[in-house]
Amino acid sequence: APWVNYLGSPAYGAIISNNAGGYSFERSGANGRILRYVFNQFDQPGRYIYLRDDESGDFWSASWQPVAKDLNDYQVKCCHGMGYTRMEASYAGISSKAVYYVPQGKAYEVWALTVTNDSDRDRSLTLTGYAEFTNHSNYEQDQVNLQYTLFITRTYFKGNYIHQMQNEIYNPNSGRFLGLAGAKVDAYCGDRDSFVGTYRSYSNPKGIEEGLKGDLNYNTNSVGALESDIVLQPGETKELTYVLGGQKTEAEITEIISRYEKSGAVEAELAQLKNYWHSKLDNLQVNTPDKNFNNMVNTWNAYNCFITFIWSRAASFQYCGLRNGFGYRDTVQDIQGIIHLAPEMAKKQIVFMLSAQVTNGAGLPLVKYDHKAGQENHPDENDENSVYAKQTGHPSYRADDALWLFPTVYKYISESGDSAFLDEEILYANDGEKGTVYDQIGRAHV
């Protein structure tokens, strides 16, 4: 199985493997897909950056996949960090470093590429960033309903980015984009068939062998591919930044890309990310004779608990991301994993989940991302026209959902000392009634 890292926040999620495979989504792994990913043994497609030597025609990638050069000639190191992943590669006298991350508080991702000429002669290189967009933001629709999804997209080239639109007449802000800062776009492609070619794959795409031809998609499969031609003298380094995102206006896209024309922008954002995660994880550090145990407890187990807390297990390489909301039981359980590290975050999420408890004491099996306390439908409307069942696919409650409030609230108060929390009033999910935290827990066992 791929070695995976999780990047982002509740607003924007990205999953990336040690070979740059993976996918991205806005808010919902089910209904907010941006990058296409096929759940198979090949870990493809992903966030690909191709490098081509224009003199020899030889090409490779900034991660081992997708080109998969012979490892006797190609060296690569992948480092998964907290909120970022870094690939360092060396081949044919050229070294590269690609850093992938989602800036703190932003709803897009950055691929920061550094290329250095380690040889003793000038090198002419073509660098190409590649992203394969979903045709539909719903994962199942994109993979299955081809009679529809192959006829709703179109790509445009806007100077330094590819813009994909979906049903643009009815939804002019539905697009996704792949943009470039730090270099001129010398060629582009927005059509998958034109980029990959017939009977080819990501390892030998026609668009890399022959160069991009400016083909755009109109009702087939959309991609974003941006090509830049550079010349590096011996020892010279070039920095480029690709930016990927969705649901942005043209003005917003232009402003976002322009941020990365400024020197030091990437370094500042990475420092901010690292400081954020250290501020959380440093709240508990264990020290035993076993360094591997310390590293697991202090860093990776804690980091994974935070990601699970943020995404509520909604997306991974095992779980395809089909749940469009927070599972009640899972989310209340997951809060327990970060109480000792971030009690303020835990409290906020406990309040949110209490507001998804109905007046009969049960929890809504699926809590929508746009949940509105006091205004929600619920499974008690269990006739054939149940609005809640149609919206969520859950026609009934689960017996143990709300019971998980007992240990979670108890652990929060034990850790924080905030016993006054029991007296705070919170709206129930289904009408205007309020109850104290203590009262709501009391109803949970009924």
What does each of the following model-derived ranges do?
Residues 1-329, 343-352, 356, 382, ...:
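Anionic coordination/interaction segments
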Residues 50, 326, 331, 335-445:
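Aromatic-rich carbohydrate-recognition surfaces in CAZymes
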